[in-house]
């Protein structure tokens, strides 16, 4: 089967980003993103941003706050220049508390770097109650029909 244009770039980008993050190499992380990179966070629209410099600022803070941060790409799938990735980030914050985030990031890849992403990576909430409690909190306590 012939690889479609962009697939190799997309896969290589995810590998570079994971490796740079695990090495805590800020410059290598930033190099994975286009200068005009666009980050959309559909579940939190106010958190979206544009630009590689915000990527630098975010990762500089993350790496300083979680000195043992490690990342894993749990799964990925790609189609041409788009790659769907499932991530897990874990480590220990400076105050000793555990850091654990899981979720999906969908990347658009151009020229071997991330041009855009739809970001769904969230902190894991342990012991937050079961599904029934969650549904009630989200939609109210009306009676089921």
Region locations from a protein language model:
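A beta-strand edge to alpha-helix "cap/lid" segment located at domain peripheries
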Residues: 2-5, 9, 40, 56-145
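Short, solvent-exposed secondary-structure junction/capping segments
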Residues: 15-19, 31-45
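Short helix-adjacent coil turns
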Residues: 24-25
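Short beta-edge strand/loop motif at the mouth of beta-sheet-based domains
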Residues: 46-57
């Amino acid at each position: 089967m012939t690889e479609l244009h962009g697939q190799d770039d997309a896969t290589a980008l995810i590998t570079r980003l994971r490796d740079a993050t695990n090495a805590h190499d800020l410059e290598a992380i930033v190099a994975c993103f286009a200068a005009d990179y666009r980050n959309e966070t559909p579940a939190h629209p106010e958190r979206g941003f544009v630009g590689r410099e915000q990527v630098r600022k975010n990762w500089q803070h993350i790496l300083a706050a979680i000195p043992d941060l490690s990342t894993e790409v749990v799964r990925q799938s790609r189609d041409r220049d788009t790659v769907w990735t499932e991530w897990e980030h874990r480590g220990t914050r400076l105050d000793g508390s555990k850091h654990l985030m899981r979720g999906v990031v969908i990347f658009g890849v151009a020229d071997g770097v991330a041009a855009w992403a739809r970001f769904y990576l969230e902190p894991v909430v342990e012991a937050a109650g079961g599904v029934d409690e969650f549904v009630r909190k989200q939609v109210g306590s009306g009676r089921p029909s």
